[in-house]
Regions:
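C-terminal catalytic domain of Rieske-type non-heme iron oxygenases
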Residues: 1-218
Length: 218
């Protein structure tokens, strides 16, 4: 069974999700409606495993590069930049990634898939944005403003130096396979944002520089 992990990098404010599969688990067949598309993605999976070695057990999930860039490493492969446009609005720029060398049949398939799945007219994007809009509106209400929100889900279960069958995963890891959910990555985002708001200089924010200098001095 695959393990579902959240991975945070405290010093930078970045975070992501990954699925950790057993070493001997085969990849499920995909895109079977078209032989050309199916063969292409089967080839891509073979190449991924060959190039990644032991890390091929890791399958990427949505993640964030602090402060406002989001990525989706699997399908649909996208990069998004979130731009605040005032207190109550955010503008999103999203890029969709297609392999330049992919056959025309694959490019046509991905174009249709991306439009149906993601983007302003996509099935999941509309659903996600509806949730965010309602959550934002509710947060402006009287009761919501009266009480502080709790972001404690999963606290105390973080793991440093996570290892599985010899594969070490950097960062601070939260295993949510059984729990299904955690606010571990969100806390990391807000933690880093707070540091930016309170820091007196860029040097105070670049903690990795101080660590590197300390190691060099030793």
């Amino acid at each position: 069974m695959a393990r579902r992990l959240q991975v945070s990098f405290y010093e930078r404010g970045h975070q992501t999700g990954v699925y950790l599969f057993p070493d001997d688990q085969p990849a499920p067949p995909s895109y079977q409606h078209s032989p050309i598309v199916a063969e292409y993605f089967a080839h891509c999976e073979e190449e991924r495993r060959r190039r990644s070695g032991a890390r091929a057990r890791l399958i990427g999930s949505p993640g964030e590069i602090f402060p406002n860039t989001a990525l989706h490493p699997r399908q649909p492969r996208t990069i998004a930049a979130w731009h605040p446009r005032g207190t109550h609005q955010t503008e999103v720029w999203r890029w969709y990634l297609v392999d330049k060398a992919a056959p025309s049949e694959v490019k046509d398939f991905l174009r249709g898939y991306y439009i149906r799945y993601s983007g302003p007219a996509g099935m999941t994007e509309q659903d996600d944005m509806e949730n965010w809009n309602y959550a934002h509106a509710a947060s402006r209400g009287t009761i919501a403003r009266r009480y502080a929100y709790s972001y404690e889900q999963g606290m105390g279960f973080e793991i440093e130096d996570y290892e599985s069958d010899g594969l070490r995963i950097p960062g601070t890891v939260m295993d949510i396979t059984e729990a299904k959910s955690s606010e571990h990555n969100l806390r990391n985002l807000y933690r880093r944002w707070t540091e930016f708001m309170e820091a007196g200089s860029w040097e105070a924010l670049a903690t990795w520089r101080r660590n590197a200098k300390a190691m060099a001095a030793e």
